[in-house]
């Protein structure tokens, strides 16, 4: 890329969560291979983000590339209305087989946020078909479900960027975020606020929606599996649907194939995305039970009212099939367990740093929470100088590396994080 390209980028192109008039610096990437990004300037950066948690097999994986090359020779896209094709059928067959038994109906969409929108629309249409006006969703504070309007309405209304949209979004119900840590003691008080809200509004609630075990972009918080068990029982008792948003956690990130497995529960609706294609193309899936699908079918519309232009994109489905084939080999379990052990060992010294409030690890997720917000520009520059790509936010420096990362590459990431928290200049005063 030329300096003119970078100047055009700075003046004309919005990047995620970035000002157009005073944007943060961007780093031009020329190529990616395995677990490393090569900058246009020639530096190699070990990637600790998996491109926002999606590239679980690393970059330029030959099995994924081969699947896309083969598919693009046949067709890159065809509409899914009135048409079907082998890549979509094969993918949905795999998803039905690998998710909990009750989840047998699949809706393919284009992104994680859309998968959440689809799940919420399913819940609303379900109750419309049953003749009940249930239009609210119950969830936890500190949650994050995406940036589209329906998804935003289920995100924390106060402790997130979505407070900007107060007054425009549907009025949903928010219980206090769970405080019992994943690896700690269960505190019965953790579910009291949630239970009270459900009891008070049970005839208004279409569904509970939550991120199982890991509250991702809302704070990278890891909570106790008992929370899920209690909520599943409450939903069963009140006849309320349970939506599990596993966009970030699905496909092995927490050490289980799906985070719901930590509590041995099955949701009524399951949202998947990010790692579905191994980080190569945008694709998501929303799965539900036969009972939910048939109830929607019997409603006034006679069908589920949603249909994205790129629904079931053959190219994305083909590479998703290849990604799931890699997962089916089972190597991810050993890889994630090794990453977890190394993260626990190598991030532990950060607890002694004055800048650090907490350190937590689960599966291939390592989180350092700091007392003060990070100085994004300064810290990003520092990480690049250290030869790593880590994208902190708020008071969080976290790692979600590809599963195929080597111990040496992972140590380079953890060394950079330890060096970062040793310097107060990397944080807001």
Swiss-Prot record:
Question: What pathway does this protein act in?
Answer: Cofactor biosynthesis; biotin biosynthesis; 7,8-diaminononanoate from 8-amino-7-oxononanoate (SAM route): step 1/1
A GO cellular component annotation here is: cytoplasm
Give the EC number.
2.6.1.62
Chain residues that bind substrate? 52, 144, 274, 307, 391
Q: What is this protein called?
A: Adenosylmethionine-8-amino-7-oxononanoate aminotransferase
| Gene name tied to this protein | bioA
Q: Which cofactor does it need?
A: pyridoxal 5'-phosphate
What family is it from? Belongs to the class-III pyridoxal-phosphate-dependent aminotransferase family. BioA subfamily.
HAMAP family to which the protein is assigned, alphabetical: BioA
Which superkingdom? Answer: Bacteria
Q: Which organism is it from?
A: Pseudescherichia vulneris
Q: Where is this site: Participates in the substrate recognition with KAPA and in a stacking interaction with the adenine ring of SAM?
A: 17
The UniProt record gives the binding positions of pyridoxal 5'-phosphate as 112-113, 245, 308-309
Q: What does this protein do?
A: Catalyzes the transfer of the alpha-amino group from S-adenosyl-L-methionine (SAM) to 7-keto-8-aminopelargonic acid (KAPA) to form 7,8-diaminopelargonic acid (DAPA). It is the only aminotransferase known to utilize SAM as an amino donor.
Q: Does the keyword Transferase apply?
A: yes
Q: What quaternary arrangement does the UniProt entry report?
A: Homodimer.
Where located? Cytoplasm
Tell me the Gene Ontology biological-process terms attached to this UniProt entry.
biotin biosynthetic process
Gene3D superfamilies with a match to the protein in the record: Aspartate Aminotransferase, domain 1, Type I PLP-dependent aspartate aminotransferase-like (Major domain)
Known catalytic reactions: (8S)-8-amino-7-oxononanoate + S-adenosyl-L-methionine = S-adenosyl-4-methylsulfanyl-2-oxobutanoate + (7R,8S)-7,8-diammoniononanoate
> Does the record carry Repeat as a key word?
no
* Keywords from the UniProt entry: Aminotransferase, Biotin biosynthesis, Cytoplasm, Pyridoxal phosphate, S-adenosyl-L-methionine, Transferase
Molecular function, one GO term: pyridoxal phosphate binding
User: What positions are modified (N6-(pyridoxal phosphate)lysine)?
Assistant: 274
